[in-house]
Design a protein with these regions (language model features):
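Short, small/polar residue-rich loop motifs at catalytic or cofactor-binding pockets
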Residues: 108-110, 226-228
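Glyoxalase I/VOC metalloenzyme domain signal
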Residues: 6-45, 51-103, 116-167, 172-224, ...
């Protein structure tokens, strides 16, 4: 398939976080929206449309599925900006491509702009000068609901250090830098394997079953086989993720 892993690749690490997957009624259109916004090239394959990550940036995958669930989703993206003008440009580009503004009660002095993409998924364009996301790249963070325990699980699963651990909130980041993945400290609501957003992990140069056992030993559980060379698993909060052979 020619995947570009691009996220903290290390030959000694089995599980690689290749992408965050989004279910959507129109994978091609939503992938093109994000490809334009992030400056990436979409790659079509048997699992949908992938926007590979590079230079520490987490990949995004768009897969055919039902309409997004109503209400706020448990995961959203944080895009960075280099200046106020750049932030305004990113927002204007997103709206021109089909995004819409979203009022979640945020105050003007907070600085960030909340939007909904054409698939109904929330994301934020963060104000310039945000020290927490400094140097993380255009896709600064994947922000998730989830407990401190699940943040610790993913740190061990990916061999990514905790870069934030305060008041039950956690965040991990590849040793090579790039996109952070963060959890709010609050329990996430699982949809029993039908979550429209999930992590996609690849076992690089190792045994799929052995890696599934390793993750289970860290607190995950097997849900079911999901096709040849794919195992659907759940993290300690019960949130589904896909583990597949390279």
């Amino acid at each position: 398939m020619g995947l570009e892993l691009g996220v903290g690749y290390c030959a000694s690490v089995q599980s690689q976080l290749v992408a965050v997957t989004y279910d959507t009624q129109d994978p091609t259109d939503l992938a093109q929206f994000w490809a334009t916004l992030l400056g990436r090239e979409p790659v079509e394959d048997a699992d949908g449309v992938l926007l590979p990550g590079a230079d520490g940036q987490v990949g995004l995958r768009f897969q055919a599925g039902g309409a997004p669930s109503r209400g706020l989703h448990r995961m959203h993206l944080h895009l960075t900006s280099t200046s106020l003008l750049d932030q305004q440009h990113v927002v204007a580009t997103a709206v021109e491509l089909g995004a819409s503004h979203l009022d979640l009660g945020q105050r003007p002095e907070e600085g960030h702009v909340v939007l909904s993409d054409p698939g109904g998924y929330e994301f934020c364009v963060i104000e310039p000068g945000n020290e927490y996301l400094a140097g993380c790249g255009p896709l600064g963070e994947v922000s998730c609901e989830g407990t401190r325990a699940v943040g610790n699980f993913w740190s061990e699963a990916l061999h990514w250090p905790l870069v934030w651990d305060r008041d039950e909130e956690t965040a991990v980041q590849s040793p090579r830098g790039g996109t952070k993945v963060a959890w709010s400290g609050e329990s996430a609501s699982s949809q029993q394997g039908n979550d429209p957003q999930r992590f996609e992990l690849v076992v690089a140069g190792g045994d799929l079953e052995a890696e599934a056992d390793r993750l289970a030993g860290l607190g995950a559980r097997r849900v079911r086989a999901a096709g040849h060379g794919v195992i659907l698993m759940a993290d300690p909060d019960g949130i589904a993720f896909r583990l597949r052979a390279h």
